[in-house]
Amino acid sequence: MTFTKFQLRLLGGFELADGAGMAIALSSKKAAALLAYLAHRPGEVVSRAKIATLLWPDRGEEQARASLRQTLSVLRKALDDEAGEAVVSSAQGLAVASQAFTIDSVEFELGAEPAADLYQGPFLDGFDIRAEIFEDWLRGERARLGARAMQTFTALLEQSQ
């Protein structure tokens, strides 16, 4: 079965679109956080326990895992991915299929197109889910990608002189 290649923008905010560029709304901030976290490391399998702790640090393990299952269901419905081809489940955990998404933050880091065109602002700018461990990760990624953007813009400025 084939599936639509999704477009995910994480630089400057969170925007998700289908292959035709039509916006896809997620009914839950946690679903967006789950997708952003997995998509920022395409193909990497992340354990359910790690994700549950990241997104629901104030809940017990059983309740956090139940919340993860529910959030994954919400995400898959929005993506029309009940077969699990875009967000892949395995015994080891969850992953985003790298061929299912075009992800601006990943392309920015790979230098797939002019980085200055891709960088639209801080990583997940304005995004907040009130989960301290996720927020710590988010701050780190914002700082790292912001520094990378500054290097890119500095190099462009030096080239133009």
Predicted features, each with a name:
Residues 1-7:
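Generic start-of-chain signal for non-secretory N-termini
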Residues 2, 24-25, 29-30, 40-43, ...:
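Intrinsically disordered, charged and Pro/Gly-enriched terminal/linker segments
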Residues 10-32:
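A structural micro-motif at secondary-structure boundaries
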Residues 37-51:
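Short capping segments at the starts of secondary-structure elements
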Residues 51, 75, 108:
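Residue-level signal for inorganic ion chemistry
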Residues 72, 76-83:
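C-terminal flanking helix
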